[in-house]
Amino acid sequence: MSRPRRPGPEGRQPTIKQVAERAGVSPMTVSRTLAGGSGVRPEVQQRVLEAVQKLGYHRNENARSLRPGHRSGLIGVAITNLANPYYGTFALGVEEVAATYGRRIILGNTGEDADRETQLVADFIGRQIEGLIIVPSASSADHLGPDRIGGLPAVLASRRVYGLELDTVVLDDVGGAYRGTRHLIESGHRRIGYLGNVLSVFTGQRRFSGYERALTEQGLAVHPELVQRGQQDVESAGAALARLLDSDDPPTAIFSANNRNTIGALSEIGRRIRGGTDPSRLPALVGFDDFELADLSPVPLAVIAHDPHQLGAEAARLLFHRMESTDPVPARTIELPVTLRIIRP
């Protein structure tokens, strides 16, 4: 049986003609805009894209190649950072489970950008994916609501979106950050800095909560000047640590909320050691997420370890369970455990 078309906000799939009418342009202009915008003025492109979003229109890229009664065999996987090896391992976990069900994955990168994520999901749906696994870039996501994706089975991985009844796989973010920060406190540190995501990101909020809880339980203040948020890559994380270390009263230890921040911090520490700084004068680190070459750290280091392959595999299993269910099943949330791995005391 062929898959039903995804409904738009009014309960049916809008046509390219309806998009053109709403934008006040020709159907050809809509097609050219969606194909990259060559020869279309920017203000016209903006009107077309607004109409596309308002109507919930999706290009059906596979319509000509799919024969009636045939499935695409595709699972869309949207991640936030293709440059992060963590997500390569995550995607491998998804792919291996998908292969056992005779499906293939198509992978897309959102760059932690909500608009880019919205377009990526629309592109996936246009390719007639059978299911979606997504690491959401924001705590709100209207483009994942039932009026936008219809009955498409979808699973959220690593992060929850409040208000959406979708199957979700997350990590013990709060507990992991708490244990990591407690480890630093028990090692004698009192001024502990923080590198992580903004609070609007689900994991950013949860991991900061664990850090904050560990400090307050021990009667230690959370100093705003020791908190650096919003770093998305190694370079910006290194710069964030440099700001902390160059302050009048620098931290003696750092809790880092993800591997990009940890690697960036270690890069800055290495730069200072090469410049002649004694390693004993540099901060100890605990980082959320294990990573390759962690054992080469020149300063005390521990990581909150978990398996991104398992995270991807669990998300895929939830998705295929949802796809194969013949009766309505309430949305499930699975929280995977994490462990503290002390690499260099």
Map each language-model feature to its residues.
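N-terminal helix-turn-helix DNA-binding module of bacterial transcription factors
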Residues: 1-71
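Short beta->alpha connector loops
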Residues: 111-114, 135-140, 260
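Amphipathic helical "hinge" segments at domain boundaries
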Residues: 58-123, 127-130, 209-212, 216, ...
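Bacterial carbohydrate/catabolite-sensing allosteric modules
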Residues: 1-9, 54, 96-101, 149-156, ...
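Acidic, Gly/Pro-rich loop/turn segments at junctions of secondary structure
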Residues: 131-144, 156-165
